[in-house]
Amino acid sequence: MSKKRIVVGMSGGVDSSVTAWLLKQQGYDVVGLFMKNWEDDDDSEYCSTRQDWIDVVSVADLIGVDVEAVNFAAEYKDRVFADFLREYSAGRTPNPDVLCNAEIKFKAFLDHAMALGADTIATGHYARVREVDGRFELLKAFDHTKDQSYFLHRLNQAQLSRTLFPLGEMPKTKVREIAAEIGLPNAKKKDSTGICFIGERPFRDFLNRYLPTKPGPIKTPDGKTIGEHIGLAFYTLGQRKGIGIGGSRDGTGDAWYVARKDMAANTLYVVQGHDHPWLLAHTVHADDLSWVAGHAPAEGTHLGAKTRYRQADAPCTVARAAGGALTLTFSEAQWAVTPGQSAVLYDGEVCLGGGIISAAEPAVVEKAIA
């Protein structure tokens, strides 16, 4: 009987490298597949694709697996980056990693892997898959500090049924130990933190290459103009640094935070103080929903939710989950809930899915003075 073939997404990082080694040790027929999904500035100092490929080849040679590269740059631009720009243009703050996982890593990549004769695929994500009575659940990783289920919440049954997450049961420290013990050339390589496949770079400069500046007033809730913004697309709710209005103006010493965007008036509203009422919301609305099990949780269900990555699950109640819309009411006010980000629901360790935040209702309704 031939060995089960697993195609591993190898990025050149430690996690995917250890993933490939673990599966090789378990006796699988492992094939590494390196994705190139960005090529607008291959010669830029911020583009690490060339070095990443070198690392992949070096690791593959060391652990004894075949590896090849595939170019999904066109798919990435069409399915992920175009949406990224549309969202920013509309004043929202998207999370491209969520869409990249659903459309590229677990769709385009999965399809390509199946064409290579794969039985299943594997990646270095920190999450777990559990089969229960023929259905597949997405679970948080054992190492909650590295859990990536938030970014994977749009995966469906077909995708999860063909996916392995070998690192889901171990802490990141153990992964680093394994990398050092087996002599991986990238054992000390730092984790990537930039935009999915685009890398680490000055974000405002990068965005300005694709979206024009459109200056407008920066106002306080009482209507006072205190500065000028360069374009609403370049700011996100809860932002404290880089607003360009200096320090305290009321003697309190409290920092300024971006609180609202009025797209029609091209006005950016800022408030002072981390806990200003404009930054707090008890009700969150989301659309563009995706559920791991294929159906939404029942209305009235008490669950946990994240409205941003690395946030602790916040107790909430599903007030509505019908007609393509989701409304969550939280027990405690949530801070700087940002349209464009994902609201992801959890039942304990199980990630149920979620949607894209469309709006948040402030804990205290205060109308801005124009």
UniProtKB/Swiss-Prot annotation:
Compartmental location:
Cytoplasm
List, alphabetically, the Pfam families matched.
tRNA_Me_trans (PF03054), tRNA_Me_trans_C (PF20258), tRNA_Me_trans_M (PF20259)
Q: List the transmembrane segments.
A: none
Disulphide bridges, residue numbers: C100-C196
**Site annotation Interaction with tRNA: residues:** H125, Q341
Q: Where is this region: Interaction with tRNA?
A: 146-148, 308-309
Q: Does the keyword ATP-binding apply?
A: yes
GO BP annotations of the record are: tRNA wobble position uridine thiolation
Q: Does the keyword field hold Chloroplast?
A: no
Q: Which UniProt keywords apply?
A: ATP-binding, Cytoplasm, Disulfide bond, Nucleotide-binding, RNA-binding, Transferase, tRNA processing, tRNA-binding
Q: Which reaction does it catalyse?
A: S-sulfanyl-L-cysteinyl-[protein] + uridine(34) in tRNA + AH2 + ATP = 2-thiouridine(34) in tRNA + L-cysteinyl-[protein] + A + AMP + diphosphate + H(+)
Locate the region Interaction with target base in tRNA: 95-97
* Active-site residues annotated for this sequence: C100 (nucleophile), C196 (cysteine persulfide intermediate)
The UniProt record lists the EC number as 2.8.1.13
Q: Which family does it belong to?
A: Belongs to the MnmA/TRMU family.
What is known about what this protein does? Catalyzes the 2-thiolation of uridine at the wobble position (U34) of tRNA, leading to the formation of s(2)U34.
Q: What is this protein called?
A: tRNA-specific 2-thiouridylase MnmA
What species was this sequence derived from? Ralstonia pickettii (strain 12J)
Lineage, broadest ranks: Bacteria, Pseudomonadati, Pseudomonadota, Betaproteobacteria, Burkholderiales
